[in-house]
């Protein structure tokens, strides 16, 4: 929930203009353009253009840019609004209809302009904004996904609804997954803005108050459709004492989301059903498509979504991406944040005098992080239309002897069939229950590890001021008594991802919910025995937090990943605690093996002519999955085991090791090396050889 306390004396109709405006300015100026936050020690010290300075959003943006220390604030608006813009803090205003507007802006900024917020965002404004950028290039933040002609000017756009951190759609067809990092930023920025409004440092755009209460809202929408009052786009409608005003915001333009064309070369002769549309399921689908096999993803949610804020991939995982499909790796690199150094640093967080426990070289641009949602966004762009079925909650699987296909049953009463079913449905996998069999077996479900995490995203300028450059732009792990913390940059380096783990001897109170409400006070208490650096990290977390329970499959591992023509992959097969940061990477390894096996199986079936083959199609596919099980089971189970143990080592809970630096370093090194240095090419060779043996080809 996003709430701001309105100062006494501010009229409701003024207050109702703040919600969308504050959110949009926060996203545009600070998340997209990277301005330092008001009140921080850093200052912008560069010029900025606010296109549409007399709009509600533009009026706020001018004031925030001034508070962030911009050396020169330029705006565009009608001449009759020049005085208004000046009163807000604009240094110069230009008429956007003036044919010489661009040149005047360039002259005013001495051709050095590199930051622009377009608060109108039409095709015409986009071209003007891009043209006004100086000769060294820059960035324009739009309110819509617009394009311009200049290649040296980066185009970004924001959508205020993402600040709620929830899935939403526009017109039922344009779907946007949850972005938890936007919610965390919005909470922080709204709290900051609350103080600025209370101190009188932010003035609202004058609203227009309509008549006829809620009924008048429709008149307001109609006026905006007809192009009336486009600049003052805030409306209040008096509806009574209990609800005095309503803020109506409408956009007359539509969003166009590009779709990847259907892959006409992908075959449907081998029907593959993937249950689950997270990173594990989508990477597998792309790997199959690369090999000419068109799968169908059955996702129980209404859209693609990933739980959690940050994610990183170790060197082995990046290698597996390239094997699976080089475009997957390219997509990952497009959204990653480059570390300040190519080292992973483990620190003793319990000693006031800083001490490095261990450092490991990651390789060039190794183990980089990104926002989970950003990576998934990039991946799904490559999925052909028709690859995904949303709102499909699996309830049963039927794999009968003699049947040509496996049947899937969903909670909405629908069914589907496929030759192969692969469960990528996460830690609470329904497919895992089928593979293991029996009624309510312990291995059907993950179990609480007696650790939970506080997660938070900290604005980078705030983190930089508190910790310095090295501790903010490079991956750090802080070890200590019964707790440990991880930090690394995400969101283009604008945010520091903080994950603070705590040991909990109690049982988890709610078996249905993996997150429960908490506060910063809880986190501060959990890390009170740590040094000032770690306490400073914890102190930067938001006041309202969640406790994220760490569940895994260590206590009751799946004895097999395969049953007949059904298998499980990723967290569905081997959910591990996140202390190695390797769970998603192992899912990519799984996907590489599965994609190659199904490709080999399909090639074998094409050559042998299914109708006359000595080995029936169903048997070939079973042997492919048996090969997958043989290749992946031991390594995946080891990951679950080592992840549990390394978490205990990080927190001084191994009696033989404690927090002894030499012993900790030795454990960290060999365990990480076994993950990072894994020979993916050799794994693929072993896979091919074993499958051929299964078929009697060698």
UniProtKB/Swiss-Prot annotation:
Q: Which keywords belong to this entry? A: FAD, Flavoprotein, NADP, Nucleotide-binding, Oxidoreductase
Q: What is this protein called?
A: Dual trans-enoyl reductase/FAD-dependent monooxygenase tazHJ
GO BP of this protein? secondary metabolite biosynthetic process
According to its UniProt entry, this protein's organism is Aspergillus terreus (strain NIH 2624 / FGSC A1156)
GO MF entries:
FAD binding; oxidoreductase activity, acting on NAD(P)H
- Residues binding NADP(+) are 54-57, 78-81, 96, 279-280
Spell out the catalytic residues: 455
Changes seen on gene knockout = Does not affect the accumulation of azaterrilone A.
- Metabolic or biological pathway, per its Swiss-Prot or TrEMBL entry: Secondary metabolite biosynthesis
Alphabetized InterPro entries for the sequence: ADH-like_C (IPR013149), FAD-bd (IPR002938), FAD/NAD-bd_sf (IPR036188), FAD_monoxygenase (IPR051104), NAD(P)-bd_dom_sf (IPR036291), Trans-enoyl_RdTase-like (IPR047122)
Q: What does this protein do?
A: Dual trans-enoyl reductase/FAD-dependent monooxygenase; part of the gene cluster that mediates the biosynthesis of azaterrilone A and other azaphilones, a class of fungal metabolites characterized by a highly oxygenated pyrano-quinone bicyclic core and exhibiting a broad range of bioactivities.
Matches recorded under CDD domains: enoyl_reductase_like
Query: One of this protein's Pfam families, by short name?
Result: FAD_binding_3
Q: What induces it?
A: Expression is positively regulated by the azaterrilone A cluster-specific transcription factor tazR.
Positions that bind FAD: 299, 312, 372, 571, 584
Give the UniProt family note. Answer: In the N-terminal section; belongs to the zinc-containing alcohol dehydrogenase family.
What top-level class of enzyme does the UniProt entry assign?
A: oxidoreductase
What is the E.C. number? 1.-.-.-
SUPFAM superfamilies referenced in this protein's UniProt entry, alphabetically? FAD-linked reductases, C-terminal domain, FAD/NAD(P)-binding domain, NAD(P)-binding Rossmann-fold domains
